[in-house]
Amino acid sequence: QPPTDPPAGRRGTLAATVRTGFDAPYGGNPRGVTTTSQEELFRFLEDRFACAQACTECARACATRAGLVDPDGAENQELVRRKGIMCAEVCDATCRVLSEQNQADEATIRMQVEWCRQVCLESAQVFDGHPGAERTAEACRACARACTAFLDTLN
């Protein structure tokens, strides 16, 4: 219900017309805003941390893999090197976005995590075709799964 008019003797005063906190007309929250259960908050934080951790592990694995590839090697080695560098950079940037406290809005976080998920899946496919890169491909898939879980939490 909308707020009622202030008492006749107090009309025109700010104190009579502005109510905040739990005395506000809508229970302390702006219209359309609901409270989040403690369980939902814990799940959000756990999934966010798990995603950031998986991004860190993937970035490390991809940077290592890129460093092991001969820069003057065959064309497929150059692709592995480029994908490794790109995936490491995207995962590192995603970890930084997830680690910042309220520095990015939800749309920015969602876009960054989705981009990371896509790059990880593409990189895993490239690493699958490169002997010795199986662990790196698995790190990429684990990161993509963590990104998917976090995106599910945001929905």
Where are these regions (language model features)?
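Amphipathic alpha-helical hairpins
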Residues: 18-155
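Compositionally biased, low-complexity flexible segments
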Residues: 2-20
